[in-house]
Curated annotation (Swiss-Prot):
The keyword Cell wall biogenesis/degradation does not apply. It comes from Aeromonas salmonicida (strain A449). It catalyses: a purine D-ribonucleoside + phosphate = a purine nucleobase + alpha-D-ribose 1-phosphate; adenosine + phosphate = alpha-D-ribose 1-phosphate + adenine; cytidine + phosphate = cytosine + alpha-D-ribose 1-phosphate; guanosine + phosphate = alpha-D-ribose 1-phosphate + guanine. One of its GO terms (cellular component) is cytosol. Belongs to the nucleoside phosphorylase PpnP family. This is Pyrimidine/purine nucleoside phosphorylase. Its EC number is 2.4.2.1, 2.4.2.2. Keywords: Glycosyltransferase, Transferase. GO terms for molecular function: guanosine phosphorylase activity; purine-nucleoside phosphorylase activity; thymidine phosphorylase activity; uridine phosphorylase activity. Catalyzes the phosphorolysis of diverse nucleosides, yielding D-ribose 1-phosphate and the respective free bases. Can use uridine, adenosine, guanosine, cytidine, thymidine, inosine and xanthosine as substrates. Also catalyzes the reverse reactions.
Length: 94
């Protein structure tokens, strides 16, 4: 079953799904600054565009482009700077 999610006044939208017990979402972020909290560990892969991120326990910002991934610990948070509309895949690692 597909689950549609919408955040930040519709500027971030995703569709959640399960495949063989693995949970994931695919979505698009409009340009903007965002902060997300995580319940479970997750891996974010940039499908198209770029995401500049700052993990909760780091001072530095890192930019990830098409095909690149980063992981975020569970029970944590991360900040995002999105300069152009960007598509992503989020895989939940628990």
């Amino acid at each position: 079953m597909l689950k549609v999610n919408e955040y930040f006044d519709g500027n971030v939208k995703s569709i959640g799904f399960e495949q063989k017990g693995d949970k994931a979402t695919v979505g698009v972020m409009e340009a903007g600054d965002y902060q997300f909290n995580t319940a479970a560990p997750e891996r974010m892969t940039v499908v198209k565009g770029a995401l500049t991120i700052q993990l909760a326990d780091e001072d530095e910002w890192h930019t990830y482009s098409q095909g690149q991934s980063f992981e975020v610990a569970g029970h944590s948070s991360f900040k995002l700077e999105v300069k152009t509309p960007t598509a992503y895949l989020c895989e939940f690692l628990d």
